[in-house]
């Protein structure tokens, strides 16, 4: 009864989470404590998990010998009471009472892992095809402590005992392979911890996630009027609207900016994809201006007839005329081109740091050509605005 009520009281308390997520704690970096996911985990493309917090880094039954002694005294008192009841009961109930006493002893044992708030398997939450019972036989705790009051060996590792490793594929595979071939006595200190921490701290990002995002954005900003011969979708013959062009371009450049904040941008494959995205955005802006140059200038006071796109603009009840609307569109395009120029500057610095990679020269040449294209579009906007 006392054990059950204690468990109910413990389970009724709100679970307190750690201040740092598992990924930041494993990487030994400061966590921004974002809920439900911190910024570092979002940029790295992994699941953010906050483990249950404890006041000290060891399991509670390792650090509370007084609780073990009090529980043992309660168990002995219950046993004496049940023995007294068994002596005064009829002889035909002796066998049944003995069975109940044995079951009560098992339920009240202070070393039963099911009675703890956190089971012993908390130290091995990584996905593994091996059953939990088999994993327990391979853990750091070789056996449960005996009734003489001896404590189980303390878990020795570079991190606190309450850390639950995140689901990082290469870490999980390495740790599972090590557990299968080593005995519990050898696992008290594993030198591979240092290697895992060093490897993980230098490769925070996942190139696959950034490449997937970049490829999706590249597909969205691709010129819809051009089509591959293998494509089942026919190319569009009409021009994309002004608002759709600006919205797609801004979304694409925001994604490029996010990817540049990830260490994956230091890889040549990711950098080339980002350059392709910027090229598509610049070409969409160029096509927007080129088509307007082909219209008669009598239709608009400006040399660039951006008012051809029937995009209503108003400030409250004040509806803008064609001249004001064209000027605003020119300012918006100029602002977007300036943002592209800043991103190209960041890509240029990344290309300079890739001097040891064979494709660095191609990347640098590509970026220079985009800088030239950006300047030409800006000059075209300025000339049209001056007319």
Curated annotation (Swiss-Prot):
Residues 68-87 have a biased composition (Polar residues). It is found in: Nucleus. It comes from the Eukaryota. Keywords: DNA-binding, Metal-binding, Nucleus, Transcription, Transcription regulation, Zinc. It holds the Pfam family Zn_clus. InterPro entries: AflR, OAF3, Zn2-C6_fun-type_DNA-bd_sf, Zn2Cys6_DnaBD. GO terms for cellular component: nucleus. GO terms for biological process: aflatoxin biosynthetic process; polyketide biosynthetic process; positive regulation of secondary metabolite biosynthetic process. Residues 68-94 are annotated as: Disordered. One of its GO terms (molecular function) is DNA-binding transcription factor activity, RNA polymerase II-specific. Residues 21-48 bind DNA. The keyword Transcription applies. Its main location: nucleus. Transcription factor; part of the gene cluster that mediates the biosynthesis of a methylated derivative of known natural products orthosporin and diaporthin. Positively regultaes the expression of the non-reducing polyketide synthase aoiG and the O-methyltransferase aoiO. This is Zn(2)-C6 fungal-type trascription factor aoiH. It comes from Aspergillus oryzae (strain ATCC 42149 / RIB 40) (Yellow koji mold). The lineage of its organism: Eukaryota, Fungi, Dikarya, Ascomycota, Pezizomycotina.
């Amino acid at each position: 009864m006392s054990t059950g009520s204690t468990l109910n009281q413990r389970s009724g308390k709100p679970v307190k989470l750690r201040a740092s997520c598992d990924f930041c704690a494993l990487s030994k970096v400061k966590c921004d404590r974002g809920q439900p996911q911190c910024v570092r985990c979002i940029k790295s493309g992994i699941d953010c998990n906050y483990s249950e917090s404890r006041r000290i880094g060891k399991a509670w039954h390792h650090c509370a010998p007084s609780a073990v002694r009090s529980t043992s005294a309660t168990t002995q008192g219950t046993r004496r009471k049940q023995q007294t009841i068994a002596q005064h009961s009829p002889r035909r109930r002796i066998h049944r009472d003995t069975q109940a006493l044995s079951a009560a002893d098992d339920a009240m044992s202070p070393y039963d892992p099911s009675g703890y708030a956190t089971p012993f398997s908390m130290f091995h939450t990584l996905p593994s095809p091996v059953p939990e019972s088999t994993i327990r036989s391979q853990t750091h705790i070789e056996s449960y402590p005996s009734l003489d009051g001896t404590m189980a060996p303390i878990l020795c590792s570079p991190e606190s005992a309450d850390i639950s490793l995140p689901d990082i594929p290469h870490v999980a595979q390495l740790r599972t392979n090590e557990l299968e071939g080593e005995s519990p006595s050898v696992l008290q200190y594993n030198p591979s911890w240092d290697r895992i921490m060093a490897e993980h701290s230098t490769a925070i990002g996942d190139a696959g996630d950034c490449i997937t995002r970049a490829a999706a954005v590249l597909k969205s900003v691709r010129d819809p009027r051009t089509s591959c011969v293998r494509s089942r979708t026919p190319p569009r013959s009409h021009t994309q609207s002004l608002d759709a062009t600006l919205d797609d371009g801004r979304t694409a450049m925001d994604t490029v900016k996010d990817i540049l904040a990830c260490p994956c941008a230091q890889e040549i494959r990711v950098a080339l994809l980002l350059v392709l995205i910027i090229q598509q955005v610049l070409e969409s802006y160029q096509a927007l201006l080129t088509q307007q140059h082909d219209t008669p200038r009598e239709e608009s006071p400006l040399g660039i007839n951006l008012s051809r796109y029937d995009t209503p603009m108003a400030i409250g009840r004040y509806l803008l005329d064609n001249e004001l609307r064209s000027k605003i569109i020119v300012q918006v395009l100029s602002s977007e081109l300036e943002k592209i120029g800043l991103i190209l500057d960041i890509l240029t610095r990344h290309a300079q740091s890739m001097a040891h990679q064979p494709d660095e020269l191609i990347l640098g040449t590509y970026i220079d050509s985009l800088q030239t294209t950006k300047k030409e579009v800006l000059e075209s906007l300025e000339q049209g605005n001056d007319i």
